Amino acid sequence: MAQSVLVPPGPDSFRFFTRESLAAIEQRIAEEKAKRPKQERKDEDDENGPKPNSDLEAGKSLPFIYGDIPPEMVSEPLEDLDPYYINKKTFIVLNKGKAISRFSATSALYILTPFNPIRKLAIKILVHSLFNVLIMCTILTNCVFMTMSNPPDWTKNVEYTFTGIYTFESLIKILARGFCLEDFTFLRDPWNWLDFTVITFAYVTEFVNLGNVSALRTFRVLRALKTISVIPGLKTIVGALIQSVKKLSDVMILTVFCLSVFALIGLQLFMGNLRNKCLQWPPDNSTFEINITSFFNNSLDWNGTAFNRTMNMFNWDEYIEDKSHFYFLEGQNDALLCGNSSDAGQCPEGYICVKAGRNPNYGYTSFDTFSWAFLSLFRLMTQDFWENLYQLTLRAAGKTYMIFFVLVIFLGSFYLINLILAVVAMAYEEQNQATLEEAEQKEAEFQQMLEQLKKQQEEAQAAAAAASAESRDFSGAGGIGVFSESSSVASKLSSKSEKELKNRRKKKKQKEQAGEEEKEDAVRKSASEDSIRKKGFRFSLEGSRLTYEKRFSSPHQSLLSIRGSLFSPRRNSRASLFSFKGRVKDIGSENDFADDEHSTFEDNDSRRDSLFVPHRHGERRPSNVSQASRASRGIPTLPMNGKMHSAVDCNGVVSLVGGPSALTSPVGQLLPEGTTTETEIRKRRSSSYHVSMDLLEDPTSRQRAMSMASILTNTMEELEESRQKCPPCWYKFANMCLIWDCCKPWLKVKHVVNLVVMDPFVDLAITICIVLNTLFMAMEHYPMTEQFSSVLSVGNLVFTGIFTAEMFLKIIAMDPYYYFQEGWNIFDGFIVSLSLMELGLANVEGLSVLRSFRLLRVFKLAKSWPTLNMLIKIIGNSVGALGNLTLVLAIIVFIFAVVGMQLFGKSYKECVCKISNDCELPRWHMHDFFHSFLIVFRVLCGEWIETMWDCMEVAGQTMCLTVFMMVMVIGNLVVLNLFLALLLSSFSSDNLAATDDDNEMNNLQIAVGRMQKGIDFVKRKIREFIQKAFVRKQKALDEIKPLEDLNNKKDSCISNHTTIEIGKDLNYLKDGNGTTSGIGSSVEKYVVDESDYMSFINNPSLTVTVPIAVGESDFENLNTEEFSSESDMEESKEKLNATSSSEGSTVDIGAPAEGEQPEAEPEESLEPEACFTEDCVRKFKCCQISIEEGKGKLWWNLRKTCYKIVEHNWFETFIVFMILLSSGALAFEDIYIEQRKTIKTMLEYADKVFTYIFILEMLLKWVAYGFQMYFTNAWCWLDFLIVDVSLVSLTANALGYSELGAIKSLRTLRALRPLRALSRFEGMRVVVNALLGAIPSIMNVLLVCLIFWLIFSIMGVNLFAGKFYHCINYTTGEMFDVSVVNNYSECQALIESNQTARWKNVKVNFDNVGLGYLSLLQVATFKGWMDIMYAAVDSRNVELQPKYEDNLYMYLYFVIFIIFGSFFTLNLFIGVIIDNFNQQKKKFGGQDIFMTEEQKKYYNAMKKLGSKKPQKPIPRPANKFQGMVFDFVTKQVFDISIMILICLNMVTMMVETDDQSQEMTNILYWINLVFIVLFTGECVLKLISLRHYYFTIGWNIFDFVVVILSIVGMFLAELIEKYFVSPTLFRVIRLARIGRILRLIKGAKGIRTLLFALMMSLPALFNIGLLLFLVMFIYAIFGMSNFAYVKREVGIDDMFNFETFGNSMICLFQITTSAGWDGLLAPILNSGPPDCDPEKDHPGSSVKGDCGNPSVGIFFFVSYIIISFLVVVNMYIAVILENFSVATEESAEPLSEDDFEMFYEVWEKFDPDATQFIEFCKLSDFAAALDPPLLIAKPNKVQLIAMDLPMVSGDRIHCLDILFAFTKRVLGESGEMDALRIQMEERFMASNPSKVSYEPITTTLKRKQEEVSAIVIQRAYRRYLLKQKVKKVSSIYKKDKGKEDEGTPIKEDIITDKLNENSTPEKTDVTPSTTSPPSYDSVTKPEKEKFEKDKSEKEDKGKDIRESKK
């Protein structure tokens, strides 16, 4: 294969596929077969054998390098180009678009050979591009027909047409390809299976009557899937999807398992509870007296049978089944639930709690059987409407059961759902890695082609070198003259050279003469290019994969289809000049998954076209680009006049030939086609001079640089000819009409305008205008006064005017031609023209939406706001990459929508009365396509359960469950998680860090910088003036001045982010001698343009502000992309004098800056610090006290004492205790506090005590630490403020102001007290610090989201303001129909005529931007969004009564918002947090960064090793019977059978249901009894055999307890059920034992990885949980003090409210997942009558009224949701993702924990006394008893000896030595291991003090050598004896039989010895046994070679070992 690649292919590589070609292939196959037997073994092992070339796969486009296809060869069979198929019967066909199709060369259907005209015709049709288009159109039309809900009759015929076309397509394919026998035939492509099934079904349903046809007809929907097979990019995405589904199998198993366990627990706990209802009692119509109590008791026990005998007239069953007797809350379909425990829901007066009727929600929500319980838990896990289930269950069972939900939500929901995300994300990552690796591989092939070219041109090079001295000079200087293939490729572009190339190939003999001229040219070019590469640019540093040639050679195949390949992987970034951190992010990211050659380049021309594309200004260029462009811009030979030699093509791309941007893009062909304006080039050029100044100091480099420019010009011109797409007249037109420079005066005007418009201040002004304009738009609200709206409209006109003026002035200044070359300008122009159009159409009805286009102006901010820019880019990138995914998602949604409509549409119509009271279709139904689509979309948003209940009620359970589950799993869990994974991948810290336009300051920063400078200047002048006034301070002035100047210069030298700011201020830069090091000296070097001033504040990409000493700067860790690249510029700058701080380097300063050393090692000093800061002391002399004598000394001693007290850990413990107590006290202040007088008084006193204690603590700390230290610590500030709050409220109480509103609100701030606990708990502090670290970026994203949402909010205000008002009847709460009340005035009329009507608004609406935000938050969290959506869909106009679904397509506003506002922005939060998490880990996690992969593996193995030690096994009992039992019990089989029993026990528990018959109950009782007996038996057996050792094992104690409980439970079941949890629960706990068995099952590795990840994340999750609890605690107390008395409605009722601490916690836990927060917020939004009564009295309390405080309520809930839902929960996700990836790495490592455990388990058997030694003779058995990978199978003597294990006296070997040797064998040798090994031994010694200190006296190797020497001597002696014997015996040999018998063994001995010669230690290697992976060379080389090699190696190794031992 390799050879065939080497020939650079060209247009002459195409040959027709003829009969001869076929014969040749057949002959090759025959030869192969003949060769085969000999090489059989080799072939099998050769996994690195030839593989098909990925660029020539079927379906791809022909690589560019092959040139154009000769027209006569299009659509004709050609010989296969891919060398892999050289001996396979295939041929290819290329169509006009150069797409490759591969066919089998065997006969199709046994009849049609490849040369048959019918087949040829079929092939021609098949490959024709129109054929695909036809099929595509057919499918789309078919899809349109499928969306019809009641299709008319004529569609039947259309169906036949479709079927006909599909049949025709399949026939063509079958004729062209063959049916199914060979490769590349019809059925070999899985996509064709789909076609085949679809067609078969079409015919089957047509001719065979199969009953339920509609179900079968739904199969037609699968046709939509065919689009996937037709659009190429989609196949890959689907591939990725299928991959991730495969990967999900483990997670799915785990999920199902966990859910089953939880469902079992739920079944046991809540079985039948949800049927408890409030029954009216006594019955109102009762005419007789009944002793209620006795009756009631009977009824419960015998379900009413008891008294039916006594009273015939009253039928209990009927009574309780009658719905009307239950208690219903208004507007509810289900009766109110209740429970009989004290903390469950109580019934109102006159009702009792009875189990009756069906379960809630049509009976589908229950725990009555295992399957319903499972469904309920699945719903809990996906968190859909779970607050409903939560409330129902707590109401029926009691509030204590909240614990169950906490567990399920945290372990089940968060963990499992995020595992799914983690797995999908990892599958995606791997897919990405694969594409990158493929690209690397291509690059390697590419290098081979280069080599080939180099060889071809070598002779020519000599000639060329002689001819041109210049070129020789260059190649000499340039080092190795590597020829860039661009010489041949670039020239291949022009047709002239193409012919020459052909000639060259055909006439290889006359190679030299034919191409002489051209080659010389090429040589000159490549040689000089070489010099560029070496000196000017140094692109090809060693190790960099980005060699410069590749830029020019973009025409080559691999670069075309590579997408991201140019991006060097991270690990090379140190060596490569360009660090591509964001490698797939900036460029071509749409190709992350796709094979879209099409998307990258349409065809030949456009490829050529975009080879060198100048940059669009506004885009942030990847740093690599800017590097090159800087360097190239610095070249002096570039033309400086305003006019550049430029050429334009139709796309408006200007390429400035010879101009600076000729090289701007090293990644030319992959960049967005954009442009650069002249002014900008000028600006950039001046600003970037200094970059190449150093380069140009060197005369040779200067000369080279000059020649470089000319070369570029040549190459470019040659390219130019080949790439002008448009006819020349276009260019003339562009130059004439679009570039205006006609006359002098005009140019002057233009110049002036340019100066003004391009000034940074103008930019600043425009930005301010944009902000103001946005404000103006956001000020719209309802109702508005006339004046206000007129002000707004005038403002709008003004702003439109300003923006229009800006646009026209810019056009004048820049010429339209250049103006529209820049993205931002096009955007501006678009918006301005829209605004003007909108002004014209202002009065046209229905076009008001145009106003919302003004909102796009907000995006202009992105120009100067990096984060917004980044967000838009991320969304852009993702949308690119998501393009295909979105299509797939759309197809899935479409398919399910159609399936739903076809399957359930009719049932919705027929059974509508089941689900709707008025027999009208509800809003969510599947009767037509649009509504069906909405339901599917809603399921994708995660809301499936409610729509599914409706569906199950009308259309039957099984079908609905199946369809909804499929949508849920496929759509939501897989596709949406893939979405998220894509987002996370296009999101990375690099994008965050270096968002700024790479090295251009943006204009705003320049403007702000100028202002800053002005202010500084004024300040300095004033200061100087003051100082001059006081001459005595002259000296000070002299000191200050140079520093000031230095400071100003600092600004300038930091242009272009290159130099890092040093220190906080230059005053610190003293080197060791205390003199300030002269940065000035290096400053002069830079020629600085004024546009380069930089303010650090505005420049987010400079994150480093700490001085870094040279040694410690680690480029990997800096965030700015620049650094890693510029560090390499160092190499070339060694000539520069050392003082200069060359760019990118951290400035070389001798000693680290002051104040740095103490920071590194904070030593615990035992002395207090100074009280005040130095400045204070300087200003107020009185603060200086001598501590040597007098008062000062006393003071100092006092401080020391205080310091000791404060530092004492008892003090800390005491304070923590106090904090906890005071926090706890807050929890008592609920609404009942007034009734509990004693508690109230106690709390008041306690409060005072706490306050005094905290004040004392504060004073002590002040004295001990001093103000300076106390007030520089953030935690102390927190304490200080909280103490202040208590102090103020205390004082107020004392003065009698306690009833003041302000003081009351201050008291609520006491809720912050628990925050003080934060600094005291290590775990929480870690989490908080991590969070605080993330806050800046979270805030950034939050701001950006707000801007993003602002647009939707303003749009919502435009669409819906004031339209949500409606007229209702407030007694029933029903809305009047439009026929009754049509508008506001009619409603008013009703009100005046004393009707119970009211004109009312929806609480959450779009009347202003603030409320708009609230509504959008509800929509984005999918809570309460329904009401908003219904209101929007029903709205008509302001002051009109809404009408049902009048405005149906308003749904789309919400759909769009959910996609962009919710999916994107909320997931960005996850992105930011995960990202920050990783960055912080990098900051703190020191050791990993400095370890190689190998070391890491070894280190991890060792870490695990260290924690283990051999244990004494339980001795086998001496008693014979006990011994037998012992053997039986310790066998693995026993364990497994117990496991099986446990599982069976579970199954029997699953069978249990709530309404099972008596018989069933009895059966289950007996089965359970059997199990109890069996488990008791196990327990007894183990007790007998293990004796007292039984209790040393945790699991056994666990079993024992469970068994005891089961037995007790059997006898006392009734009693226990009454008071405790049902005993059956303990059986569930047994399931935990399954965890043990997982170790024994090989296949469960994946599941164990997942559990391992969970175990690893537990500590972190515990910390986050603690933090979350703290937040909940504080909010609960706030809630109690603010919302305790609000009206009970919507989500607030008798159980869920803020009245007591417990209730508040229950509510807040529910909102943690954002569930149901809208319901809790609604009552709080009631601000006055008639919604609530501000004067209402509450008995037992002085508070009046039940109104809420809307602003406090909104703040409370929104802040809580942001903190808990977005932050804490996402941290949870981040931890899990992190640990999952770690766990996966762990499981991928060769040695895991279990392997070591297994080692020690086996060890116990061989070393029963735990001596830690084993005898040498046992070693072989021991090694063979292990499991792989440590296993060394027998025969293993040789290998073990070769390991050279140290032995102690008595031939014993220590377990560690064995383990080390075995580990080394698995991991491979490595030098650094010895150090680690020593560490490990020390650690082992520490953990096992018992380890015998042993002196090895010999080693296995030495022992063997001694043995061998003995054997050699023996053998020589024996041989001598033998010879004697043989001589004697030979004469009488035949007679003497006995001797012969003696002789044979000796002979055998000799033979064995001969064999043994090969096994002496010197000669053998530790050849890996078959179990370990074979080393590749050892397999491929013949045996003999291997022995030879091994022999020598081993001898060396032996020597080394011996020497090291000495």
Curated annotation (Swiss-Prot):
Phenotype when the gene is knocked out: Conditional knockout mice deficient in brain are morphologically and organogenically indistinguishable from their heterozygous littermates. They die perinatally with severe hypoxia and massive neuronal apoptosis, notably in the brainstem. Sodium channel currents recorded from cultured neurons of knockout mice are sharply attenuated.
Region (Disordered): 28-61, 494-529, 589-635, 1121-1167, 1934-2006
Compositional bias ranges of the Basic and acidic residues kind: 511-529, 596-610, 1934-1965, 1980-2006
Residues glycosylated per entry: N285, N291, N297, N303, N308, N340
Reactions mediated catalytically: Na(+)(in) = Na(+)(out)
Pfam family, any one: Ion_trans
GO MF terms, alphabetically ordered: sodium channel activity; voltage-gated sodium channel activity
Ranges annotated as biased composition (Acidic residues): 1156-1167
Renumbered residue ranges of the record's region Binds SCN2B: 918-919
Stretches that traverse the bilayer: 130-148, 156-176, 191-208, 215-231, 251-270, 402-422, 761-779, 791-810, 825-844, 847-864, 881-899, 963-983, 1211-1228, 1242-1260, 1275-1293, 1302-1320, 1338-1357, 1449-1470, 1534-1551, 1563-1581, 1594-1611, 1625-1641, 1661-1678, 1754-1776
Modified residues (Phosphoserine): 4, 468, 471, 484, 526, 528, 531, 553-554, 558, 573, 576, 589, 610, 623, 687-688, 722, 1507, 1931, 1972
Cysteine disulfide links: C278-C338, C913-C919, C951-C960, C1367-C1387, C1732-C1747
Stretches forming III repeats: 1191-1505
InterPro entries found in the cross-reference section: Ion_trans_dom (IPR005821), IQ_motif_EF-hand-BS (IPR000048), Na_channel_asu (IPR001696), Na_chnl_inactivation_gate (IPR044564), Na_trans_assoc_dom (IPR010526), Na_trans_cytopl (IPR024583), VGCC_Ca_Na (IPR043203), Volt_channel_dom_sf (IPR027359)
Single biological process term from Gene Ontology: neuron apoptotic process
Domain IQ residue range list: 1906-1935
Site for Binds Mu-conotoxin KIIIA, residues: E330, Y362, N917, L921, E946, D950, M1375, Y1430, Y1444
Residue spans of the II repeats: 742-1014
Positions bearing the Glycyl lysine isopeptide (Lys-Gly) (interchain with G-Cter in SUMO1) cross-link: K38
The protein's role, per its UniProt record: Mediates the voltage-dependent sodium ion permeability of excitable membranes. Assuming opened or closed conformations in response to the voltage difference across the membrane, the protein forms a sodium-selective channel through which Na(+) ions may pass in accordance with their electrochemical gradient. Implicated in the regulation of hippocampal replay occurring within sharp wave ripples (SPW-R) important for memory.
Record note on quaternary structure: Heterooligomer of a large alpha subunit and a smaller beta subunit. Heterooligomer with SCN2B or SCN4B; disulfide-linked. Interacts with NEDD4L. Interacts with CALM. Interacts with TMEM233.
Family the entry assigns: Belongs to the sodium channel (TC 1.A.1.10) family. Nav1.2/SCN2A subfamily.
Protein name per the record: Sodium channel protein type 2 subunit alpha
